[in-house]
């Protein structure tokens, strides 16, 4: 359990879904923290010092403890501050949350973003592949307010920071609705529920500014191929 007097700092990047989800967890737990904005293309001396292995955000500094990788940080936060749990207590349910969270970051993320830079199979095929993956989450959230049940939890933070506010906005750059409501009614209901949660709204980048930045990132990435 965390001590009363402590120091919590978070190194993040304003459009990074990985640092946004960590902020959601800290806010849900009511943990006071200092946010340090990073300019990832330049990588500050502090970031390289605190995360020499991956050289990326998020990095959580809790007193003298350093943590990187968003899933690791989320679990640490949940185990350190016991209020408002974000992971279920049941071992099987907890394992399934971890499974789907990895699915979002390790399966949906690369398949969802790479075609924006280089669609080797064509855009139409890429869209179909992405939507096939999203359909798994559509089924998983059916009949629930959130993946975590009545309140947001670990998977809501992982999927919520990635799919509606990152993946969907990236495809909007091409004028494509990646999650049409007639195909994904449950995901869209879940997204609406997310938008009603204050800590989620506080952590999501402004839409127009976000899309403009993503357009630049996509164009820069295209120039490397």
Curated annotation (Swiss-Prot):
GO terms for cellular component: cytoplasm; cytosol. Residues 6-85 form the GST N-terminal domain. PROSITE patterns: GST_CTER (PS50405), GST_NTER (PS50404). One of its GO terms (biological process) is glutathione metabolic process. Its main location: cytoplasm. The keyword Hydrolase does not apply. The keyword Transferase applies. Its EC number is 2.5.1.18. This is Glutathione S-transferase U2.
């Amino acid at each position: 359990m965390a001590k009363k007097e402590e120091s919590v700092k978070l190194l993040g990047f304003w459009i990074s879904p990985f640092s946004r989800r960590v902020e959601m967890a800290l806010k849900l737990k009511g943990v006071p923290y200092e946010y340090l904005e990073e300019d990832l293309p330049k990588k500050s001396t502090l970031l390289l010092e605190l995360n020499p292995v991956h050289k990326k955000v998020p990095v959580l500094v809790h007193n003298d403890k350093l943590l990187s990788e968003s899933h690791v940080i989320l679990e640490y936060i949940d185990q350190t501050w016991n209020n408002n749990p974000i992971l279920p207590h049941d071992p099987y349910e907890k394992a399934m949350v971890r499974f789907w969270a990895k699915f979002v970051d390790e399966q949906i993320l690369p398949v969802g973003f790479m075609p924006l830079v280089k669609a080797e199979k064509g855009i139409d095929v890429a869209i179909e592949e992405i939507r096939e993956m999203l359909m798994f989450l559509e089924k998983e959230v059916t009949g629930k307010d959130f993946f975590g049940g009545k309140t947001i939890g670990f998977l809501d933070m992982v999927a919520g920071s990635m799919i509606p506010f990152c993946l969907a906005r990236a495809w909007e750059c091409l004028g494509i609705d990646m999650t049409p409501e007639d195909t994904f009614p449950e995901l869209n209901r879940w997204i609406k529920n997310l938008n009603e949660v204050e800590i989620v709204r506080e952590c999501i980048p402004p839409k127009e500014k976000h899309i403009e930045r993503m357009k630049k990132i996509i164009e820069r990435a295209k120039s490397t191929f």
